[in-house]
Amino acid sequence: RACPRLAGFLDEVRTRHPDYHARPVPAFGDPAPDLLIVGLAPGMHGANRSGRPFTGDHAGVLLYETLHRFGYASAPQSISVDDGLTLSGCRITNAVKCLPPANKPEPGEIRECNRFLTAEIAALPTHASILALGQIAHQAVLRALGLKLKDHPFVHASDYRLPGGRRLVSSYHCSRYNTQTRRLTPEMFAAVFTLIQSENRSCPSSPSSSPAR
């Protein structure tokens, strides 16, 4: 058990919720995507329950609606692992694979899980874009790539060209708190995807009505 705190917490969760997934949550989507979306970690009653990233809690509502609008998802909702939803040109993962207490992974846990993110990024096509949701995911991507944080600060809608041809675009996380406080609006989130698709010629077709940038 590489992360004793997380492993112990998952043991407790499985006892309280025997029907929950309560294990590391694998990535979901296209195995050779144009876009890799990196979140923070599974949510207690979302991915930790369902076994699919951003599925079953509020954080996935805006994400999957936007993915469907921009042609990446076959449906605007992700309900369960057996709902038939598919992603095309897109894959979703997390910086930390296991549910952390209070949704707050410790620095050592983020570092321990970074090897999985490193492998996921290494498997991407050279033209792929990476969308980091939130500062921790942004920093985890940079760590996985061996890049300095000070040279690539987290800013909403930032767009960094990476060595080898890939891009790192970052956004505020689509959490309930951020969307309810309007720190992140649907229009802001859609603008991030417009930015991603603006120079990604192999991406799915743009939506019928793109937001102003």
Show which residues each predicted segment covers.
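A polyanion-binding, active-site-adjacent surface
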Residues: R1-R201
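Intrinsically disordered, low-complexity terminal tails and inter-domain linkers enriched
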Residues: S202-A212
